Amino acid sequence: MHTIYVDNNATTAVAPEVVEAMTPYFTDIYFNPSSMYQPARQAADAITGARETIARLLGGVAASEVLFTSCATESNNTAIHGCLRAQPGKKHVITSAVEHPACWRCART
């Protein structure tokens, strides 16, 4: 039997090439990239390299402008708060009931 998964909003299967690329960081280079010891530097270097690659792919973006977040909620909150800070004179956020709760909760605060 073949499974058809239709809840990709919650989670989705990881592409095999992503699993292959990330395996070293789940098994061997799992260190805190903010630490000062050598294995941690490997993790930090990998993050720096990923940030530079993404900036290059986006074009016209500095690596320092690429932010990594831990989840969709954090990403949504960062984007919404960033837009609000960029437009301090604007006092309203328009959203709808079909938005993800992370978006409308953030908009309400």
Q: Predicted segments — roles?
A:
Residues 1-109:
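Pyridoxal 5′-phosphate
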